[in-house]
């Protein structure tokens, strides 16, 4: 009887511990379980010299505290599973220009 009770206690502790693990996106479609002590998900975005052509750079991940943004960065943090989805950009991207598009533009 004591063995059964001890087994139930161990299983309960393990299950409760797993329930506290936060899941965050680490890439556009890759959620992972955060390490112990990291209870926040974050999304960090910033521009580089190619930002006008390719859009902002994005870093997703887990953190113990919300990262402090540098002057050129935007950072958001949240604390529920998979709450840091890859951003959907509202800005339209320029149309690629090449031989085929030039022919299509001038029939």
UniProtKB/Swiss-Prot annotation:
Its main location: secreted. Expressed by the venom gland. It is found in: Secreted. GO terms for cellular component: extracellular region. It comes from the Eukaryota. Belongs to the three-finger toxin family. Long-chain subfamily. Type II alpha-neurotoxin sub-subfamily. This is Alpha-elapitoxin-Al2a. It comes from Austrelaps labialis.
